[in-house]
Amino acid sequence: MICAVYKSLRKADSYLFVEKRNEFERVPEALMAMFGEPQLVMMLPIDKRDHLGFADIKKVKAELKDKGFYLQLPPPVVNLLEQHKKDIGFNPE
């Protein structure tokens, strides 16, 4: 299977994988509205891949088969200062 990968111009580091190029019929309208105008990044031969950057390849393949799309969102931003305070047991109260 070769899937199409699109990036969002509205949401940084957000990618939408669909089964075929320019076929968004199975993607919910609300998601497309939030995602904005999709910009094609690449056509990806997903069957020949063992892994992807940030996404679980098995989950991507399963969701493409079941839902017709997979949405990859960026990992949550970690506040390093707050994490450090927590690690050292700092409590301002």
Swiss-Prot record:
Task: Give the coiled coil ranges.
Answer: none
Q: Which PROSITE patterns match?
A: YCGL
Signal sequence extent:
none
Q: Which Gene3D superfamilies match?
A: YcgL domain (3.10.510.20)
Classification via InterPro entries:
YcgL-like_sf, YcgL_dom
Mind telling me which HAMAP family this protein's record contains?
Answer: UPF0745 (MF_01866)
Identification of the protein by name: YcgL domain-containing protein swp_2294
What organism is this sequence from? Shewanella piezotolerans (strain WP3 / JCM 13877)
